[in-house]
């Protein structure tokens, strides 16, 4: 299958580098370069970034002072910060890009309108979707799947720090084996750590494949989408 329109999802933590917090500009530029390689090959790209490098709603609410709903809204705002940073990095590399937010912040970015997002993609612009779904209690993984379905993406790319889905944690077990392919039902049954169950269930309902790959393997995204030779696991 030829992938003409894709949704790339990666975590906010990926932007923070070794510090674990904030935005590492070198990593930001590297990721923007990987996205640019897709655009240069006529692949339409939407992006969803998490906000964990700034704040996580669940973590913020653990002490009881901040309510979960407020914590989640704080997390949504964090994703907008990351989206604006990615916009700047892509524009620095000469890529035309728009940020659309599920929460209205008209001085900073466009509000999310799916028809407008599709029009941007058709014109060759990258669209970075911020503020998750706009609702608390939903993860950015769920937001990524929702946006992918809405814009008619051919596939979701879940870009991580590992090469794919493993039978056990590769950071803890040296004999962990990567799975080239896994069904939606298997992913839901085993509660794989790559995406949450809500996101996987939505992908299943819409027959949307999920490619899980290592975003720090340079050139891998383009290899996967254009040359069908990259390293990944596929959930379908």
Curated annotation (Swiss-Prot):
GO terms for biological process: 'de novo' CTP biosynthetic process; UDP biosynthetic process. Allosterically activated by GTP. Inhibited by UTP. It catalyses: UMP + ATP = UDP + ADP. ATP binds at residues 9-12, 52, 56, 160, 166, 169. Its EC number is 2.7.4.22. UMP binds at residues 51, 72, 133-140. GO terms for cellular component: cytosol. The keyword Kinase applies. The keyword Metal-binding does not apply. Pathway: Pyrimidine metabolism; CTP biosynthesis via de novo pathway; UDP from UMP (UMPK route): step 1/1. Pfam families: AA_kinase (PF00696). Residues 17-22 are annotated as: Involved in allosteric activation by GTP. One of its GO terms (molecular function) is UMP kinase activity. Coiled coil: none annotated. Its main location: cytoplasm. PANTHER family: URIDYLATE KINASE, URIDYLATE KINASE PUMPKIN, CHLOROPLASTIC. Homohexamer. Belongs to the UMP kinase family. HAMAP family: PyrH_B (MF_01220_B). This is Uridylate kinase. It comes from Helicobacter hepaticus (strain ATCC 51449 / 3B1). The gene is pyrH.
